[in-house]
Amino acid sequence: LMQMHSSYVVTDPKGTVLVECGKMLEKGGYVIKSLNTINFRKSMHYNPFSYIRSEKDILKLVNTIIVNTKGDGDKSGEDFWVKAEKLYYTALIGYIWYEAPDHEKNFTTLLEMINASEAREDDETFKNPVDVMFDELEARDPDHFAVKQYRKYKLAAGVVCSKRLLN
């Protein structure tokens, strides 16, 4: 690093390289960008939604989310619940990417949609705000990518899966 002859991407699990070499590299004309997953206040911000260019990218993002949030147990693979969860996230992220204004294309919007996805045991006809959003989108564009994914999720999952995923 001290030779400063190239561009670098450095992993720094202990957080020492940035402290020890950061100022030197900045003085040498380098632009330092840090993604700190331990202390987000010391991190630049990363929005994966900014890198979505196609439906294939949505699927890659969903797969990355699933892989990085699954448990270590025997059932952490491609079982029914994981498949339903993938359809659900694909539908929500597809909706955000195609329909949301640029300032709402982020994980905050995704989490708000997940939190609004309430299911009620005693009322199978209940529609939460996300169901209503998808109904409106389907009325406007029945072949929309997000609508197709949400339809598959609802068909595969039903109320039972909704309750399990949202609890």
Task: Locate each region found by the language model.
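Switch/coupling segment of Walker-type NTPase motor domains
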Residues: 2-95
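Non-catalytic, charge-rich alpha-helical accessory subdomains
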Residues: 81, 85-86, 90-167
